[in-house]
């Protein structure tokens, strides 16, 4: 026995001797410290753990031979706030803290009624070669140990970012045995019912380090949690996400994106774009490049509810669709509901895009800015009232006239100009643990003209005030009131005898109250009420020159009220089965005063020839539409890595976009339902299989859906849509159906991460043959946005901490069009005969974008840190057809193809933080 003991002691001494005698030779000139760490790793058996701000941003120069690495690193860290500590063969570098490697002697003598805190003098304990914050190694006592014991308790609190104090929505909190979980709401608040006794709670969030809290639970209580950003070792790059959500979450057809995870994806002109990311997801399509709207699972562009801090955005883009309306430096997260739409949402039948802004840094002043070829932006944020509140302000503006100046004069668009600006402001204040208020405002203005004689302008504006109140650990609610505005103005003076101006506006005042009640571990109830008051000004058509022959025309304003109540229950039948069932009942009242036409009953549809007389009503309710909307989702876990989900939604929509264009346009007209234009309704059925691989770092999913739509407005042949007091004579309600399969693979971890998806889908429309004389009236015809095949790839490769490469590929079938197929003469006049509607297609779409991102190296003593982004949009230079149109020239019909970006477009932008 002594022999083996002596051998063990000798081996330990040799190991310690070898550990102490490791030497390195280093020659670096003005290089980041990360390169020093790589040299030490290669020449010794040390492992180094640090944050990226040390390894990348600290610039050093060193020329040493046969030097001891620990002494060398300590010299390099002099005059900084970073401390070096070691444990076995690991080196840890942490800001303002050192590490202890043993427990205090009194650790095991504490009683269970105390908080077991092993942190000493701002140090962090290290066990099993891991760096753990003191918050993870202490045991938190929740409740009163002397209270009457209960088998279950309710734990509530707020999860926030340790760096800036901002609350964090969408954070997963999970008890693994037994399996009980929840997620934080939009304010970072959570409520979870847990079995009493000693428990470990795991906390996960996108881009943040996984954390754990050791709890001793006696009775109901509160625990606020702070999460830190993911630490990255030199040898590995990890993209952290809610890895189990793909399998365990209830929702199907839901995409959640944190803005930090998409900033490297290449977009036109180098600006991070929320809508471009949305369009890179499966099941989301657009009519073409720089489209202002998007189509979700066969729905039209007006069937998507776009929310920004609870306010409605009617025009979500700037500058013809080049940029989205959302400032990426202000946005914190977004959720896209393609199905499994919660009962609290309503008003559109296809999807909900809910975008939320940051709250602002609650701990220190911070700013960010960027400079690009077309646009610049600036963001400022800071704490208020000693950290009880915060504010954030951001603005963007463009200087793009130089680009339009490059358009050749022969194009007919000489001397044009275009520009926009938008402003975001938000402030919040937390009075106490139960009450907090949030104020947000948004304004944007676009203007453009292709000649000096034309003018186009449009604007969005939103304001909301929100009060979050916690009645008790089980019951919380949110009250919101606000105002939304959208308007456009056009003026044309090319011909003074026909010079005119045209304007349109829609205003809405809204209010809502949402309640969440945590009944028990199996039931969570959500209920609420909301209402919207609409005032729509359809248009004023006015002469703008003394010689103009235009006759003044002012359409009467329209007023309506939309209200709804809802109730839903999330029921956990067992750890394997979970169901969410909800009902929403909506009511739409058409308000007076109103003038309307009375049509002859001899005609199937309203028409000019069928008008019998005009009638008017005063104030009051002219007509009411109402109906229930059902929501049902279910999930079954097959095993820990596989689940199957299904759901059904029924939706109602009372406002419609009137347009004869495939894409959204600033001059599109919106129309409220009236006596003859009925609300749109839609029903969607969906099911899917979800499975994770490679230790939950690769997510896969297959979703199948079928959707029906009724009363979708399609324009009639020869329709005149502008300034129509009887718009019902120019449009017709049609039926629609859409179905498809979406396949997606996500890689969440490693230097290479991103996703690839394939979608096969169809979107079809149908009119009864009595409604029109078109050739294919009795058949289903493809919708204008029908694209059967679509493949999308988004990838990021992290070369080093400072350098990364991004690639975006997009392929889709060309959208359908109607073309002239013959010409004929009748009574001395030539006519063109068109094909069946949407029988042909434009050429297939294909585009590749690449970008290279450089994180600039700076000394820690500097106040600013920047990064540089360069790339090429449409790297292959393919001339994708935006549209195909035909012009009669010398008695011949000539076809033309319009391409928006027919060549590679290089771009560069510089971003700075301070």
Regions inferred by a protein language model and the residue ranges of each:
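N-terminal export/assembly leaders
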Residues: 16-112, 183, 254, 296
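C-terminal beta-signal and adjacent terminal beta-strands/loops
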Residues: 802, 811-829, 845-849, 853-914
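Periplasmic N-terminal accessory/gating domains of Gram-negative outer-membrane beta-barrel systems
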Residues: 117-146, 183, 207-209, 221, ...
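Surface-exposed extracellular loop regions of Gram-negative outer-membrane beta-barrel proteins
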Residues: 487-489, 535-547, 551, 589-613, ...
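N-terminal periplasmic "start-of-domain" segments of outer-membrane beta-barrel proteins
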Residues: 19-25, 47-60, 147, 152-154, ...
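Transmembrane beta-barrel wall of Gram-negative outer-membrane proteins
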Residues: 372-397, 410-447, 455-483, 519-521
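Outer membrane beta-barrel strand-and-loop segments of large Gram-negative receptors
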Residues: 508-512, 554, 562-564, 672-678, ...
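Gram-negative outer-membrane beta-barrel transporters
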Residues: 706-708, 727-821
């Amino acid at each position: 026995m002594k022999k083996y003991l002596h051998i063990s002691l000798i081996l330990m001494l040799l190991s310690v001797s070898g550990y102490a005698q490791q030497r390195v030779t280093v020659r670096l000139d003005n290089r980041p410290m990360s390169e020093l760490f790589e040299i030490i790793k290669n020449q010794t058996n040390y492992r180094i753990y640090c944050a990226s701000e040390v390894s990348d941003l600290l610039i050093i120069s060193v020329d040493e031979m046969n030097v001891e690495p620990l002494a060398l690193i300590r010299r390099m860290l002099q005059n900084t706030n970073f401390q070096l500590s070691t444990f076995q063969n690991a080196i840890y570098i942490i800001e303002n803290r050192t590490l202890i490697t043993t427990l205090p002697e009194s650790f095991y003598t504490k009683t269970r009624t105390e908080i077991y805190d092993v942190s000493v003098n701002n140090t962090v304990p290290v066990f099993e070669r891991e760096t753990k914050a003191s918050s993870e190694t202490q045991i938190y006592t929740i409740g009163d140990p002397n209270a009457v014991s209960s088998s279950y308790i309710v734990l509530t609190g707020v999860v926030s970012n340790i760096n800036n104090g901002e609350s964090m929505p969408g954070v997963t909190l999970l008890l693994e045995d037994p399996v009980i979980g929840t997620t934080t709401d939009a304010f970072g608040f959570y409520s979870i019912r847990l079995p009493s006794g000693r428990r470990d709670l795991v906390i996960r969030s996108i881009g943040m380090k996984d954390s754990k809290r050791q709890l001793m639970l006696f009775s109901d209580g509160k625990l606020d949690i702070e999460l830190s950003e993911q630490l990255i070792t030199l040898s590995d790059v990890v993209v952290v996400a809610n890895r189990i959500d793909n399998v365990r979450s209830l929702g199907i057809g839901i995409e959640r994106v944190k803005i930090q995870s998409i900033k490297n994806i290449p977009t036109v002109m180098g600006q991070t774009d929320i809508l471009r990311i949305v369009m890179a997801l499966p099941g989301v399509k657009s009519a073409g490049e720089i489209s202002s709207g998007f189509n979700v699972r066969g729905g039209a562009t007006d069937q998507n509810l776009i929310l920004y801090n609870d306010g409605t955005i009617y025009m979500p883009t700037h500058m013809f669709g080049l940029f989205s309306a959302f400032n990426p430096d202000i946005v914190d997260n977004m959720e896209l509901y393609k199905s499994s739409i919660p009962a609290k949402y309503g008003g559109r039948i296809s999807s909900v895009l809910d975008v939320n802004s940051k709250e602002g840094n609650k701990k220190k002043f911070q700013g960010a800015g960027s400079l690009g070829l077309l646009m610049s932006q600036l963001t400022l944020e800071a704490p208020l009232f000693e950290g009880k509140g915060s504010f954030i302000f951001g603005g963007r503006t463009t200087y793009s006239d130089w680009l339009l100046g490059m358009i050749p004069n022969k194009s007919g668009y000489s001397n044009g100009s275009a520009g926009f600006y938008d402003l975001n402001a938000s402030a919040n204040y937390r009075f106490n643990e139960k009450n907090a208020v949030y104020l947000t405002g948004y304004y944007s203005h676009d203007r453009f003209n292709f000649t000096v004689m034309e003018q186009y302008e449009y604007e969005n504006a939103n304001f909301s005030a929100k009060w979050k109140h916690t009645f008790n650990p089980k019951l919380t609610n949110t009250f919101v009131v606000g105002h939304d505005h959208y308007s456009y103005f056009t003026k044309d003076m090319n011909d003074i005898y026909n010079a005119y101006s045209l304007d349109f506006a829609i205003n809405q005042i809204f209010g809502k109250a949402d309640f969440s009640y945590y009944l028990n571990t199996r039931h969570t109830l959500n209920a609420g009420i909301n209402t919207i008051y609409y005032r729509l000004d359809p248009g004023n058509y006015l002469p703008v020159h003394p010689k103009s022959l235009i006759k003044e025309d002012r359409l009467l304003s329209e007023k309506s009220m939309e209200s709804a109540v809802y109730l839903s229950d999330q029921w956990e039948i067992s750890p394997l089965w979970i169901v969410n069932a909800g009902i929403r009942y909506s009511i739409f009242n058409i308000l007076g005063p109103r003038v309307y036409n009375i049509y002859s009953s001899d005609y199937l549809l309203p028409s000019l020839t069928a008008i019998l007389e005009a009638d008017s009503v005063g104030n009051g309710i002219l007509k009411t539409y109402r109906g229930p909307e059902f929501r049902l989702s279910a999930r079954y876990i097959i095993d820990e890595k596989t689940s199957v989900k299904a759901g059904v939604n029924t939706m109602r929509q009372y406002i419609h976009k009137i347009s004869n264009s495939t894409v959204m346009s600033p001059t599109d007209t919106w129309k409220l339902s009236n006596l003859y234009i009925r609300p749109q309704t839609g029903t969607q059925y969906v099911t899917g299989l979800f499975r994770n691989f490679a230790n939950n770092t690769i997510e896969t999913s297959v979703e199948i859906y079928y959707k029906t739509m009724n009363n979708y407005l399609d324009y009639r042949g020869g329709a005149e849509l502008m300034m129509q007091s009887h718009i019902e004579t120019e449009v017709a309600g049609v039926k629609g159906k859409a179905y498809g399969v979406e396949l997606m693979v996500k890689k969440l971890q490693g230097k290479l991460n991103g996703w690839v998806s394939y979608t096969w889908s169809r979107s079809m429309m149908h009119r009864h043959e009595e409604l029109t004389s078109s050739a294919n009236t009795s058949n289903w015809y493809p919708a204008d946005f029908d694209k059967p095949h679509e493949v999308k790839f988004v990838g990021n490769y992290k070369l080093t901490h400072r350098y990364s490469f991004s690639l975006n590929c997009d392929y889709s079938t060309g959208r359908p069009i109607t073309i002239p197929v013959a010409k004929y003469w009748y009574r001395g006049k030539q006519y063109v005969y068109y094909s069946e509607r949407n029988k042909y297609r434009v050429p297939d779409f294909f585009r590749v974008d690449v970008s290279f991102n450089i994180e600039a190296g700076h000394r820690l003593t500097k106040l600013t840190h920047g990064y540089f982004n360069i790339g090429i949009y449409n790297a292959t230079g393919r001339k994708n057809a935006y549209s195909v149109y035909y012009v009669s020239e010398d008695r011949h019909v000539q076809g033309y193809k319009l391409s928006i970006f027919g060549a590679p477009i290089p771009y560069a932008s510089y971003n700075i933080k301070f």
